[in-house]
């Protein structure tokens, strides 16, 4: 008998290849015949795993991440689609900066160039508000636009304006969790601590994000659902992509 072993990463500890390496040692010692296959949920390090299965690099280019650093960012050809792993630009390993000082606005520069975006492995907790601020939605304090809003600025937001440049986006998003953005078991409570959030900061985000999304829902004259499964991926980025921008969320 031969055993097939499929291994994903153990976030924050081992890559899928490292997991396979440890299992191989045990199987070899016990003379167990096996075949090994790295797998991915579309999150962090998914680019490397896709390449192991023959998907080719579409482009390697220098992009600015959420901390301001210029990094080589890789997109892949996946069947007839262009794929990007968003953690390359907003990943938890990119910086030690506080997540309240970070947002997703850097993704606005790549979203038009790809067909599929993957979630997971982020340090962000901005519910995609940073990205939305670059996609035609202004977040204001009274009549003053808050440029590039970050979570630390959320308490200042008391008005929202939808500009003519705002439009829906016909693309796909791979999400690696069923956790909602808001609710009892929300993204801030579940993933916030591993991104350095204190309990007081989690409560701050819950309160202000819900308030801001109510403003946004009223301004769009649309029912936005931050309690829907899967809207909490990458600090709520999947909410902004799916509920506001209209991308299709695919659970994997």
Where are these regions (language model features)?
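Glycine/threonine-rich beta-strand-loop-alpha-helix active-site module
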Residues: 102-112, 116-119, 123-170
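N-terminal beta1-alpha1 ligand-phosphate binding loop
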Residues: 6-22
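Carboxylate- and glycine-rich phosphate/diphosphate-binding segment that chelates Mg2+/Mn2+
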Residues: 86, 144-145, 149-152, 171-236
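Hydrophobic alpha-helical hairpins/lids featuring a short glycine-rich hinge
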Residues: 78, 82-118
């Amino acid at each position: 008998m031969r055993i097939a072993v499929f291994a994903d990463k153990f976030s924050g500890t081992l890559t899928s290849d490292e997991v396979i390496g440890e299992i191989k040692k045990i199987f070899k010692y016990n003379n167990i015949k096996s075949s090994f296959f790295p797998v991915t949920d579309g999150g962090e390090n998914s680019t490397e795993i896709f390449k192991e299965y023959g998907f080719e690099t579409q482009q390697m280019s220098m992009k600015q991440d959420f901390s301001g650093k210029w990094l080589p960012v890789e997109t892949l050809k996946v069947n007839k689609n262009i794929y990007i792993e968003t953690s390359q630009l907003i990943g938890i390993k990119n910086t030690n900066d506080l997540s309240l000082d970070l947002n997703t606005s850097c993704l606005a520069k790549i979203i038009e160039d790809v067909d599929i975006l993957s979630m997971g492995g982020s340090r962000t907790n901005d519910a995609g508000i940073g990205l939305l601020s670059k996609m035609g939605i202004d977040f204001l304090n009274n009549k003053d636009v808050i440029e590039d809003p970050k979570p630390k600025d959320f308490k200042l937001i008391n008005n929202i304006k939808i500009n003519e440049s705002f439009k829906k986006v016909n693309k796909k998003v791979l999400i690696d969790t069923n956790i909602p953005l808001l609710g009892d078991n929300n993204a801030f409570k579940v993933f916030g601590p591993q991104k350095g959030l204190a309990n007081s900061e989690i409560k701050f985000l819950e309160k202000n994000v819900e308030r801001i999304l109510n403003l946004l829902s009223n301004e769009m004259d649309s029912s936005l659902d931050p309690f829907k499964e899967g809207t909490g991926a990458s600090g709520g980025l999947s909410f902004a992509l799916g509920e506001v921008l209209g991308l299709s969320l695919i659970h994997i």
